[in-house]
């Protein structure tokens, strides 16, 4: 049995974060079809890229980037919650995006510090400088 498509209201809610205009119901219906068509195009490409990277792999992966592990991030978030009972998938995805941006920003600062020293290896002193410049050290 194939998966149910997205609900137009859900797609409309997500799409509304990219515009300040209202979205007509018929447009929301069309967006569901368009998103599913984009998945029809995307998934086979991702399958090929996944198997090109690892022919034995059984799970679809994003070969274009390495992401923080979803389950590990979720578990770490659950360990830290105090006022709610669980962590939803949107929160995990948002957390991963936030952490990856943080890591990217931190690495850029580390690179700058290493470049000033005219070295090609990020060392602990460069991390300290980066953290200090970000107000975290």
Segments the model singles out, each with a brief description of its role:
Residues 1-137:
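Intrinsically disordered, low-complexity terminal regions
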């Amino acid at each position: 049995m194939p998966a149910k498509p997205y609900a137009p209201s859900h797609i409309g809610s997500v799409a509304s974060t990219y515009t300040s205009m209202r979205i007509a119901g018929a447009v929301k219906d069309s967006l569901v079809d368009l998103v599913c068509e984009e998945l029809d195009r995307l998934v086979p490409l991702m399958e090929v890229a996944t198997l090109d990277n690892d022919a034995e792999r059984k799970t679809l992966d994003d070969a274009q980037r390495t992401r923080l592990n979803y389950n590990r991030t979720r578990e770490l978030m659950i360990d830290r919650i105090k006022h709610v009972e669980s962590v939803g998938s949107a929160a995990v995805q948002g957390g991963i995006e936030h952490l990856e941006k943080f890591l990217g920003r931190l690495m850029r600062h580390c690179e700058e510090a290493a470049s000033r020293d005219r070295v090609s290896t990020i060392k602990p002193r460069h991390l300290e400088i980066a953290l200090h410049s970000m107000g975290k050290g």
